Amino acid sequence: MPFRLRKRPSEQITTATKNGEKLHQYAACVNQQCPGVSTAEDIFSFLDAVDGRTNAEFLAPCSAGPRLCHIADHLSVYNDFLQLLDMELKEDKPGEFGLFPLKVHYPVGADQRSCIKGWSLLHWLLREHCCVKTLILPWLIDSKYQRLLSDALHLNSGLKKLTLHNWQAKRAFKDIISAIGTLAQLEELDMELVYLPPSALGCLGTALQRISTLKTLKLPSVDMDVCNASHLSCITQFVKALKGCPKLAVLSSDNFLLVPASGEGFAEFVMESSSLTKLSLCHSPRYHSKECALFMAVGKNNNLEELCLDGFMLYEEAERLLAEVAAQHTGLRYLEVGFYDGFREWEINGTALANLVGRNTGLRELVFSGGTVSCIPEFAEAIPKNATMQKLTLGLLDMDVPNYRVFLQALARNQSLQLVTFKESSYYYFNDIVLLVRETGTEGRLAIDADVHDPQDFEKGLKNSTSLTRVAYSNREAAGLTPPGAFRHLLHHRCLHELRIGLPRPIEMESATSLALLLSTTSSLRCATFEFLATASSSRILVEGLAGNRSLTDLSVSFWTIEAPEADLLWRMLRSSRTLKTLTLELLDFPQSPMLDRVPEGLLQNHYLLRAAIQRNPTPSLDMYHDGIHRQVLKKLNVLSTPTFQFGVQELLRRNLSTLHRAVQFVTGSRGRRYAEAFERVSKGSTLVEALKKALAEPEDKIKGRIASSSRYLDEHFLVEAGVVRAAVVCGESGRVQLDRIGFDNWLCIRQYLKVTDIVLTPVGLLADPSSSGSLQD
């Protein structure tokens, strides 16, 4: 047996002593930042326990770089305590980690004795691990922990994205803003839901100028008095500070930037910026803004690609100016203006924007809301002239069938528009629209963003078409019952991509059977939402339909009755699903098990699911759902799942996300057992294709070719990637390679029954038999 060096007992004691001293020092530091919350000794005891659970790797420095940081192996330990803050640590991108809220509607810091554990870990992760790139904080932070957070940000060296929510603590926020200015690698700062006094803008402006890497900025709302000279001065100084952000490409804010005192300065910033490509402004009625100066500035900055004016109700002069600027702009690709509402005090005329469509500009997408049907003739005249625009969205009050007829006849003469979407609050002429689309030959090019409500109209529309791609039916307020045969017509829609159904009464057996048949036979349906009561027998049929589905990527189910056989079938369906990545199972009735306390085995075996909400305990708020049926179910189902179950679900999702990242890395060249095992688990599903398309920006056929090539590589180099050999198998003294191309076909026959997880590596300390004729060849 070969000789092995071992640490002397004194060396082990020295290491343990040093680690203990380091933990004591860190515990004292945390206690100093949060006086009165706990004691340094209690914090030390907790950290020492964490160190033990991570095999003494807690104190190890961040190992990010070519290899994965060691915190990837201990996510369960960290999340066991971060969940006390309603937060989680997960691998957001390959090799990059982030801290995210679990339930953003819950305040943080309610139980101080427990929360200090979570805050200690959060502080440590931000201070010591540059692989943590994202921090999205929950809604409210207890003031006792704000110093600790500020200290963590000051000491951080890796954050690229920071999001703050609903911060209202005015005194402590200056420390946080100061700390933000020290984040040397920050690329995205989101303060959209923060509410600040004007005086804090000076500190924020100074901090932003110190971050040379900042690319995306969402500004906070400001509690400003437009008659207060001091407030206006703060806004003006902040606008000047924006010029000190040389890489700022995306800017989002409400219109406090456009008040008369700072409007000219902001327009100057927009005009001169060489990096700004996307500008989003949200109108607030508290401020009187000057849009015209902004529009002129936009016209002089050809780098700008997207302009969003959310909630702006433009007068005729401003609308004409905006349309003229957009028409002459050589870089603008996306324009959004107005807002859609069932009631408005005045409307945007819309004529100038309609004429813009007919001028064949570089604009690829226009979203216009806030007008009436009076501008439909102008749009109908302009659309046939356009040869460049690809998407158009309109939110116009008082649309009816004759207006749609005029519009669709014009759309039929247009070749470039791929999709036109109309925003509606509700509509009762579904069948008429279906007939018009068929008559004008515009199938697949029109979408109406509203639910169908009338049962008879719903059935007629389904019957008179076979090319619908999206169906949303909500009969909660309708007096009549849905005709039992209505859903049967869905079987003829071979291009159906999205289906959403809500009913006021338990679904009838015939309807359930039709839906089940659709689910089990469709190859096109990707998203399905079912929100209706279902008896045990109806639920059984529906679950059987789901079990036969091979296309859904997004599934949401509410109010079904799931007995033991159906529950078993449901979990088995999830085990075998290779397409489903988003799952919502809420307020289901499990008569045999009123409370879920462990994650079912079938669900645990699913490696494709990335987002899930399963039997989460609802809040007692009566307005969580908007009809009596939902409140009845809420009362019936008091407790739906235990914290252990919910933690298990989150663990599964984190595991699957990391598995997907390892598989992506395998396809892009990373090698080793960890990567090969992950690739083998998810290579047959659609999630890997989508992840690679996002990572590599390549077409789907090329991505599938990459996956096929990686599969062939793994087949050929299985023994190496599984860790059996280093490079090849050598037999005897001749050095001849035993496994070569000669027996490759035979090897493939064996390989089809063999997975990476079937190979059990020799535990550390056990040596190979010296009499073995095989040896490792590098």
Predicted regions and their residues:
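Leucine-rich repeat
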Residues: 91-99, 127-134, 154-161, 181-188, ...
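Cullin-RING E3 adaptor/co-adaptor recruitment helices
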Residues: 2-132, 139-141, 398, 426, ...
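Extracellular leucine-rich repeat
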Residues: 99-116, 125-143, 152-170, 178-198, ...
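Recurring C-terminal helix/loop segment of individual leucine-rich repeat
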Residues: 124-127, 148-154, 175-181, 203-209, ...
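Eukaryotic tandem repeat interaction scaffolds
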Residues: 337, 349-353, 495-585
